[in-house]
Structure formats: structure tokens, C-alpha cells
Amino acid sequence: MLVAGWSAGGNIAAVTCQLARDRGGPDIAGQLLVCPVTDCTFDRPSYNDNATGYFLTRSLMYWFWDLYCSPADRTDPRVSPLRGKVAGLPPAFVVTCEFDPLRDEGVAYAEAMAAAGVPVEHLRASGHFHSSFAMVDVVITGVPGRAQMAGALRRFAGLPEVSRGDESSKGHDSPEHRIAAAAS
């Protein structure tokens, strides 16, 4: 099983990995966390650097947190996974974007997992903002990053990498083949 999530979904994926480890399953082979929400604090530099102007704003994050849970519950690791135990988690591919209020908490989560011995790949997406990877036909600079994410999921699943010109990929029109072709 693999888990993946973007933003709040990244939070859910991270918490799912911690709960699966603590409860003895299910076995998770890898986690893809794209711009994940990992902590309830707003005092990291990226919250000031990217407070406005890049789709996801600091004030919008305040609003989301107020909808999600009470201030008293925010430090619970099931809400803020950065505050939980990160040792023993499955391999991770973490994406953070330069112009994202969540950048620094994503970096902190990737660094905490790596320090605890979790295999971590970290894509620091320069020039990207919180939702730019989802804008497939608009932000074409996201193609290589999306290909890296797909490659990580394939590795976690034990599948071979797909590359343009691979004889086995000729004549196929699956999404992973289109991603590989666009990225090369």
C-alpha cells in the first residue's frame, strides 16, 4: 500500500503512516507528501515570506485551521504530525514549494524523518507555489517534478522506472507513459 496527499491530504497521509506504524498495520511501502500541512504553528519564516499573493495565504490557513479543529487539539500528533514520533515510518518523497506558506513545515518534517533514519527524498521546487503542480496545462515547469513524484511511487511499489524510448512503452497511452515522455 502507498499513501499520497497534497496539502491537507499530505497531513492525512503523514498521520496515516504514523498510525499504521503504531497500530501494527497496514504495511505502507511509501509516502508521497506534496506541500504537506505538518504543524499547527504559524511562526515559521515561510508564513511571513508567502503570507499573500501566492494562492494559499496565511489568513486562509488560519481559516482552515479554525474549521479543522479547536486550538486545544492542534498540538496532537494526529493533527500536527511533526509533533509525533517519526522514526520507523515508511520511505518518503516530500515536495515543498518555494512560494508556499507551508514550505518550512514541510522541510522540517522531511528533515525530522531523515534525522530519525527514514529514507527521504526531498524535492525543493524553486519557483513553484502551493498549487502549481496541480496546474498541469498551465505551469509546464511542473512536468519534471510530477515525473519525479510518479517515479517515487513506482519505486515504493517495486515497479520499474518508465523512460521515453523504452521498448516496452511504445504504443501505450497510459498517464505514466505520457508523464515520462513529457519529462524527457
Language-model features, listed with the residues they occupy:
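Alpha/beta-hydrolase superfamily serine-hydrolase fold, recognizing
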Residues: 1-184
